Every structure is written in structure tokens, then in C-alpha cells.
């Protein structure tokens, strides 16, 4: 079956040190790049794209992926930003991709496969994997019980589903629950977090990841490449607690 076009949505606020990670995530996707669109909603004081020259350079780096960049002078909640990006999206399939998560190359394809297998209109994982660069790159994991606890950064859904549910809640934590609550049957399906992403613990996390550092230790089960490790070190080099 032919793969559909997908709009990838990234909300950001003063996360420019994560630009190399964002570009790496896009580049590694095992998906036809000409079928992808990247939408950025930025309300930071340090703009992601500061000039027409910057815009031209980013477009060149991610080509043939198309880029839509929007900057707003007033800081808004993550839920508001996610809703705005969906409305700006060209395509009928939406994938969330947050700034500070390391995505697996399989994220888009495996999510789409699950959507088709289950006849779902939204898929995502209620599991989470965390990596702690400040603690010798320890990796831990948790598994939540409910579909409403699907991690927003792992969501792939249709615009039709978004419109039917009224979008994300207008807050910055747990905003994705409104995309699941009240949706019965198999319209919402669960993906494996190992096919999606790893959350990176750092000082600027929206939700403090330190609370999960003593959960299940899966360090030996996750094979991070030296390139991935060096990328994280470079991104967090200004954080005092990282062991470089």
C-alpha cells in the first residue's frame, strides 16, 4: 500500500541547542522524505530561525522535506501550539516530534502500520524510555496503564480524529488526554515505545525526568550508537551536571 504524506509537528521555545538532534531525527526517518512536511511553532525569545538566510539554510539541509516555520511573540501553552500546527498542516496525517527526544528511524512507518492494522485514527505509546546523560547514560523505562496516558511526542493521528476530538487541551502537561478520552473501540491503538523515541533528561524538561531515574533499568537492553551519545553530549555540553 502506498505511503501517505505526513506533516511532522514540532513545538519549540528556546531549544536551539537541540537543533542538531531535530535535524538528525528527520534525517534518520525510514520514510520517503519527499512525502514529509516539517512544521515548527516557535514562541521563544531566541528564535529558531532568525533571518531569511537561516530559513534558506534549514530548507536546504532538510530537503526534500518541506518546511513551514511560524514564530509568535507571545508565549503560549504546548497544547495551544500543537493545535495551531495541526491547523497549519498540509497533510491529513499528523506526527508529533518534540525537540528534546531522540526518535527511532522506525517511528513513522511502525506507527502508520499500527494505525492500519487496528483501523485506528490515533496511535501512540503509553510507555516511556528515559536516558540520563548526567548519570553515565543510564536508561530507564516505565509503562502506564491507560491509553489516555499516551505520550504526546509519540502520537500519530489523522486530522479527522483531531477535529472530532476538539484537539489538544490548552495546557502544557497531559494535553494529549483530550485526544483519547471518550474515543471507544479500536480508534486509539498503542505502539511500542522502542519503535518511537527515547526521552532525554536535561535541565529544561517540561516535566522533570529525575522522578523516573530509579524505575526499571534497561541500559543493557538499549543499543545506543557512539554517534548518538556524542550528539547528546554536544547538545548538553553547557549543562554542569553532564559527564562529558
Explain the meaning of each model-derived region.
Residues 72-89:
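Glycine-rich, basic loop-to-helix element that forms the pyrophosphate-binding segment
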Residues 34-47, 68-72:
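Short beta-strand/loop segment that forms part of the nucleotide-sugar
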Residues 106-137:
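Conserved donor NDP-sugar-binding/catalytic core segment of glycosyltransferases
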Amino acid at each position: 500500500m502506498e505511503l501517505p504524506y505526513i506533516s511532522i509537528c514540532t513545538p519549540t521555545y528556546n531549544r536551539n541547542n537541540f537543533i542538531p538532534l531535530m535535524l538528525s531525527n528527520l534525517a534518520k526517518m525510514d520514510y520517503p522524505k519527499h512525502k514529509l512536511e516539517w512544521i515548527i511553532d516557535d514562541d521563544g525569545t531566541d528564535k529558531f530561525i532568525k533571518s531569511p538566510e537561516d530559513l534558506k539554510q534549514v530548507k536546504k539541509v532538510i530537503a526534500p522535506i518541506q518546511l513551514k516555520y511560524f514564530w509568535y511573540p507571545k508565549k503560549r501553552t504546548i497544547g495551544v501550539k500543537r493545535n495551531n500546527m495541526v491547523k497549519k498542516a498540509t497533510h491529513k496525517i499528523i506526527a508529533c516530534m518534540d525537540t528534546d527526544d531522540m526518535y527511532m528511524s522506525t517511528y513513522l512507518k511502525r506507527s502508520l502500520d499500527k494505525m492500519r492494522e487496528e483501523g485506528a485514527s490515533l496511535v501512540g505509546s503509553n510507555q516511556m524510555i528515559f536516558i540520563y546523560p548526567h548519570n553515565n547514560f543510564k536508561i530507564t523505562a516505565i509503562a502506564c496503564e491507560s491509553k489516555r496516558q499516551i505520550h504526546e511526542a509519540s502520537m500519530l493521528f489523522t486530522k479527522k480524529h483531531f477535529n472530532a476530538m476538539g484537539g489538544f487541551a490548552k495546557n502544557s502537561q497531559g494535553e494529549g488526554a483530550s485526544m483519547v478520552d471518550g474515543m471507544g473501540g479500536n480508534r486509539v491503538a498503542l505502539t511500542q515505545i522502542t519503535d518511537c523515541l527515547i526521552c532525554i533528561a536535561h535541565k529544561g524538561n517540561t516535566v522533570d525526568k529525575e522522578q523516573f531515574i530509579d524505575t526499571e533499568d534497561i541500559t543493557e537492553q538499549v543499543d545506543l550508537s557512539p554517534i548518538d551519545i556524542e550528539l547528546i553530549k554536544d547538545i548538553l555540553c553547557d549543562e554542569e551536571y553532564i559527564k562529558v
